[in-house]
Amino acid sequence: VRTIVGRLLIALGGFLLVAGLVAAIWAPGVVKKTPVDVDSVTHLSGQGGKVDASTGEITVGPVVASSITKVDTEASDDDVAVFVSTSCLMKDEGDVPDCVDADDPRLLNASTDLFATDRTTALTVPNGRYVPAGTEQATGLQNKWPFDAKKKTYPYWDGTAGKAYDAVFQREEDVQGMKTYVYKVVIENAPIEVAEGVPGTYNSSKELYIDPITGAIINQTDVQTRFLDSGTQALDLKLEFTEQQQRTNVDDAKDNQRSLKLVTTWIPIVGIAGGLLAIVGGILLVLREGRRRPDDTTTDDVFADGTESPRH
């Protein structure tokens, strides 16, 4: 019986060992990828206002913003995730939805972007077949950092300026109980169209708070101004993720961290350690059973009282 149990343990140990090694070597490259089931809304709030064409003055008041992000699953593949992102900036008046119609007086600005990113590095890839012809070619990071983010400078795409800028690592900071890496993006006097056919300049100082394990953006602040070429200020804006949005992002990131740790750490540890223990235990059982087995010749030559049979 011990031999049978031992052999079963050896077989089980071999299975666990292989499973643990596969999880350790193969799993990180599979699970540390941007998912293709993204369908999220990010909420920001702050103060802002745009110039009143009749008076030439800016009335600053409470504003809200939303970013609606979805993955186009049909256009995406194993290596690339294709995103459709719609952003709306609105006056915080009444019951404001995620976005309002173009003729709604509460609307301050709206835009829709299509882009494709590498599911491993999170960097934007060439548009190619992933987005419609004529779509602006972006570069750099956009809606997340890579898994296992580093304390270094990354290129970060700014859709308003139409250019990638350096996102420079600044510090570590706690957000809602989660350690984040803070990166700063500074844009000065970037030439833009303040309105259709109206040239001007754009300034922005962004700070992005990143979960270094998953690369998720936990919080973001943005201080932004836009000016006409005449020097008249056209937009004044200060935005940050809402407190609820930050809590949601932290909870989601922690859930993803636990899933990653299970697959990349605990399954390999349990598989490899458990497999080795089972193999060693199985071998010991087989060897012990072999040592306990009596010698047939010796048994035949000895009487029950312990005396040897006579030799002829």
Predicted regions and their residues:
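Extracellular or lumenal secretory-pathway regions
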Residues: 2-148, 257-261, 284-292
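Juxtamembrane interface at the cytosolic side of transmembrane helices
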Residues: 2-8, 258-312
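Ser/Thr- (and often Asn-) enriched beta-sheet segments in non-cytosolic proteins
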Residues: 59, 168, 184, 221, ...
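A broadly tuned preference for mixed-charge, low-complexity surface segments
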Residues: 70-76, 222-236, 265-275
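Extended, hydrophilic extramembrane loops/domains of integral membrane proteins
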Residues: 210-256
